[in-house]
Curated annotation (Swiss-Prot):
UniProt-recorded Gene Ontology molecular function terms: ATP binding; ATP-dependent protein folding chaperone
Protein name stated in the entry: RuBisCO large subunit-binding protein subunit alpha, chloroplastic
InterPro entries in the record: Chaperonin_Cpn60_CS, Cpn60/GroEL, Cpn60/GroEL/TCP-1, GroEL-like_apical_dom_sf, GROEL-like_equatorial_sf, TCP-1-like_intermed_sf
Miscellaneous information on this protein: This protein shows ATPase activity.
Keywords: ATP-binding, Chaperone, Chloroplast, Nucleotide-binding, Phosphoprotein, Plastid, Transit peptide
NCBIfam families given in the database record: GroEL, PRK00013.1, PRK12849.1, PRK12850.1, PRK12851.1
UniProt-listed SUPFAM superfamilies: GroEL apical domain-like (SSF52029), GroEL equatorial domain-like (SSF48592), GroEL-intermediate domain like (SSF54849)
Organelle targeting peptide span: 1-45
Localisation per UniProt entry: Plastid, Chloroplast
Pfam families (UniProt xref): Cpn60_TCP1 (PF00118)
Organism: Brassica napus (Rape)
Gene Ontology biological process terms, A to Z: protein refolding
Length: 583
């Protein structure tokens, strides 16, 4: 991080076009000449290893099996933990995507197969927030049975077509069978299951959503005590994320996380870096991160911010302002009051004339690619309540239904607050595991609210396997029909939940397959029962994403005919010891 003195002049900031950015150094009308160099550069690729046909597929399968075996251990309420040897103390986790991301295999070709399963887990985690282990196990099973068929002479392209068509039909069936979430009981059940049957976490997530709604729950924080608590703080969430992923400060979660950040709010478009150089200098001298909320940040300004962020000169992020037109200005006023109630936001004020005293302050800022959460200082509570009262008065007086709805949205964002889940534990290892479980529970709950719920415990996938024969009848090509059979075999791999609980998986699958939709096996209590009534439920979105992503990656593997990887470099021999020195 640059020191305050290092940014005393604008010329220190690196421009995306020049070595130095000099504020106002280029005279108006002055032309910058560029001279093409005559040098020619040749790039030499590393030596490669190439494998074809069965050899390539066997290497992929070996890597896929190793990673899927490790991830599959965690499946179900009685799944096992996995110890990850990382920097510092080992981490004990039960989270599929965390395990997948930590595994790198020594064999380059096998690692290529493992990377495909990592992609399944990561993509499912990004889209649904949970179900990564299920997606990994499904992908492995589809690939395993698919490669056997390819080796036996089946057309891989036709197999892929059959898999894709079958999965699409199953998703349509899933949408018909899912039901919406009904109150806090369902929310608690979903959160409890996703947290590894931890009822305390389930109750906490349900309590947080009950207090502020699903939009008000913020990312998880570490607590200074041993207890895990939910605290509702003044704040709001806006439906705009960072303009560029280069601003990310937490690469693992793809988030920007700031504390005690200064906030520049404007309804103008920022294109020239010289307009904000004074603000950048001041915030850097204060060692405070800067959040810029503007109509847009483009061109030279964006490029220069990104370059200096990557070089560690600036701690900054840019976000587009929410809304459009007059509504955008009103929402920016709301944000201004939340972050700095003592300073009125002057929309006519030019960005270059903004002083450090006119910037807002946010105690905590969390920004994803889709949303921004601001937690305000407690001192803004009185002004915030006054703003809410004003908006309620405007809503009461307006005759427009549209305006009334938009005012209601703004009131909800300002009054709902932000529920901060502060996680406590006795050790760092337990803290990390607990935070991962709460993150899964929170994401699964949002997914359930979005697309509804289905029976859990793997029962939904087993029940879906029974409709595949009817789907297969609509296919004419033999290899396309074989693709449907592959999906059917993969769906019953959820028997792994029973196996992890010490029960014969095939027997469990056989019983579930010929029972009603709601009935399934509860591995926690070792009983067959109505899973919806017992609270063993999964979000339909998680099941859908796991199935789609597994089929997508499996299709790519089945149509792969060769692998090209870097050839390992031979290890240099150890230097000989000097004469007379014993090693």
């Amino acid at each position: 991080m640059a020191t305050a003195n290092a940014l005393s002049s604008p010329s220190v900031l690196c421009s995306s076009r020049q070595g130095k950015l000099s504020g106002g150094s280029q005279q108006k009308g002055q032309r910058v000449s560029y001279r093409k160099a005559n040098r020619r550069f040749s790039l030499r690729a590393n030596v490669k290893e190439i494998a074809f046909d069965q050899s390539s597929r066997a290497a992929l399968q070996a890597g896929i099996d190793k990673l899927a075996d490790a991830v599959g251990l965690t499946l179900g309420p009685r799944g096992r933990n996995v110890v990850l040897d990382e920097f510092g103390s080992p981490k004990v986790v039960n989270d599929g995507v965390t395990i997948a991301r930590a595994i790198e295999l020594p064999d380059a070709m096998e690692n290529a197969g493992a990377a495909l399963i990592r992609e399944v887990a990561s993509k499912t985690n990004d889209s649904a927030g949970d179900g990564t282990t299920t997606a990994s196990v499904l992908a492995r099973e589809i690939i395993k049975h698919g490669l056997l068929s390819v080796t036996s002479g089946a057309n891989p392209v036709s197999l892929k077509r059959g898999i894709d068509k079958t999965v699409q039909a199953l998703i349509e069936e899933l949408e018909k069978r899912s039901r919406p979430v009904k109150g806090g009981r369902d929310i608690k059940a979903v959160a409890t299951i996703s947290a590894g049957n931890d009822e305390l976490i389930g109750a906490m997530i349900a309590d947080a959503i009950d207090k502020v709604g699903p939009d008000g729950v913020s990312p998880i924080e570490s607590s200074s005590s041993f207890e895990t608590t939910v605290e509702v703080e003044e704040g709001m969430e806006i439906d705009r994320g960072y303009i560029s992923p280069q601003f990310v400060t937490n690469p693992e979660k793809l988030l920007v996380e700031f504390e005690n950040a200064r906030v520049l709010i404007t309804d103008q478009k920022i294109t020239a870096i010289k307009d904000i150089i004074p603000i950048l200098e001041k915030t850097t001298q204060l060692r405070a991160p800067l959040l810029i909320i503007a109509e847009d940040v483009t061109g030279e300004a964006l490029a220069t911010l990104v370059v200096n962020k990557l070089r560690g000169v600036l701690n900054v992020v840019a976000v587009k302002a929410p809304g459009f037109g007059e509504r955008r200005k009103a929402m920016l006023q709301d944000i201004a009051i939340l972050t700095e109630p003592s300073t009125a936001l002057d929309m006519g004020l030019l960005v270059e004339n903004t002083t450090i005293d006119q910037l807002g302050i946010a105690r905590k800022v969390t920004i994803s690619k889709d949303s921004t959460t601001l937690i305000a200082d407690a001192a803004s509570k009185a002004e915030l309540q006054a703003r809410i009262s004003q908006l309620k008065k405007e809503s009461f007086e307006t005759d427009s239904v549209y305006d009334s709805e938009k005012l209601a949205e703004r009131i909800a964002k300002l009054s709902g607050g932000v529920a901060v889940i502060k996680v406590g534990a006795a050790t760092e290892t337990e803290l990390e595991d607990r935070k991962l479980r709460i993150e899964d529970a929170k994401n699964a709950t949002f997914a359930a609210i979005e697309e509804g719920i289905v029976p859990g415990g793997g029962a939904t996938l087993v029940h879906l396997s029974t409709v595949i024969p009817a789907i297969k009848e609509t296919f004419e090509d033999a290899d396309v029909r074989l693709g449907a059979d592959i999906v059917q075999k993969a769906l019953v791999a959820q028997s792994l939940i029973a196996q992890n609980a010490g029960i014969e998986g095939e027997v469990v699958v056989e019983k579930i397959m010929f029972s009603e939709w709601e009935l399934g096996y509860n591995a926690m209590t070792d009983t067959y029962e109505n899973l919806l009534e017992a609270g063993v439920i999964d979000p339909a979105k998680v099941t859908r994403c796991a199935l789609q992503n597994a089929a997508s990656v499996a299709g790519m593997v089945l149509t792969t005919q060769a692998i090209v990887v870097d050839k390992p470099k031979p290890k240099a021999p150890a230097a000989a010891a000097p004469e007379g020195l014993m090693v």
